[in-house]
Amino acid sequence: KIFKYILIYLNIMANRIEQMEMVQNEGLELFKKKNKDYGDAFAEYGVIGVLVRMGDKIKRLQNIEKNQITLVNDEKMKDTLIDLHNYAAMAIMLLDEDDK
C-alpha cells in the first residue's frame, strides 16, 4: 500500500515540474515579445522601477479578483501573474548585474 502512495506522490511531483516548465516557457515567450518591442526599458529605473511595476500588477490582481473584471485589453488574472513572474525575473537580472 505504501508503494502505491509513493507512486502517486512521484506522479504529482513530476506533473508539478512539467507545470513549472510550462509557466517558465510561457513567461519566456512573453518576455521575448515584449523585449523586442521595448528593449531594456525595464532596466531604466533599476530594481526599484521593476518593484513599482510589480506593485501595479498586484493592484491589478486585487481589482480583478475583487470586481471580477478585467482592466486593460481583456487582461486576465493569468496574464497578470505571468507578468509578475517576468518582473521578478527582471529584478533578479538587475540584482545579478549589480553584484558583478
Model-derived regions, located:
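Intrinsically disordered, low-complexity regulatory regions
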Residues: 3-100
